[in-house]
Design a protein with these regions (language model features):
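Active-site-adjacent helix/loop patches that line small-molecule binding or acyl-intermediate pockets
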Residues: 1-98
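Structured C-terminal helix/loop/strand segments within mature extracytoplasmic catalytic/sensor domains
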Residues: 71-79, 83-222
Length: 222
């Protein structure tokens, strides 16, 4: 779709570096329609990037390794690529057919609804999963409900001390809208995989304030 650079080299979670793709059973209306074959993939090439190692140490299997963490075999999806992908999701009509995702109107509507829906409207306890739980921009550092007139279509990520939000924000009352993508690393001790990241103390408040600042700029530009 013309989105570069992107490199998806491994799964998420346990055994993410397993090169064998397990077979998938495909169901339709409780009936099996097909089974895919197991595939043995090639090992990923090292990323040709600067600063592929970060920090001063990391944990592996509960053992502290006192050397920088190597990200050269990890997935690579920079925020420039995320931002360009979001544009195609929100404004497909602005792109050539070859650059659009092959989604039906129903699929497009479902995707946007999933990106916009806050946890309480999906049946989750709002005391635990408040509106800003996965809406870092503007509301990430508050447990207030997001007003109905402010629509946030986004996808967040957090791993290895890095927080990312990629969002389309639309105020239907003030008649303003904007796209915003940002990422921040919060790993004060320089140790990866120790679960001691400053997400709540630094990362989320920073992204929330960034969203508010850009929102205010858009109000002034209007």
């Amino acid at each position: 779709k013309g989105i570069t650079p992107v490199r998806i080299a491994h799964r998420l979670g346990q055994h993410s570096d397993d090169l064998r793709t397990k077979p998938l059973i495909i169901y339709l209306n409780d009936s099996t329609t097909g089974i895919t074959k197991s595939i043995l993939n090639k090992p990923p090439l090292e990323l040709n990037l600067l600063n592929r190692t970060k920090g001063s140490a990391y944990y592996e299997d509960d053992i502290l390794i006192t050397e920088p963490f190597d990200f050269s075999s990890k997935n690579y999806f920079p925020i420039s690529s995320q931002h360009n992908l979001l544009k195609r999701v929100i404004f497909p009509q602005n792109f050539d057919k070859s650059e659009r995702f092959n989604l039906s109107d129903e699929q497009q509507e479902y995707l946007l609804s999933a990106m916009h829906t806050v946890p309480r409207k999906a049946g989750y306890d709002p005391k635990t999963y408040y509106d800003g739980y996965c809406k870092f921009f503007i509301y990430g550092d508050t447990k207030e409900n997001i007003p109905e007139y402010l629509e946030i279509y986004n996808k967040v990520g957090f791993a290895y001390g890095t927080l990312t939000d990629c969002a389309y924000i639309k105020d239907t009352e003030k008649n303003i809208d904007f796209l915003l993508t940002a990422t921040i690393l919060v790993n004060k001790d320089g140790i990866f995989n120790d679960d001691a990241y400053e997400y709540d103390e630094i990362g989320i408040p920073f992204l929330a304030q960034l969203g508010r600042e850009i929102y205010q700029q858009e109000l002034k530009r209007k």
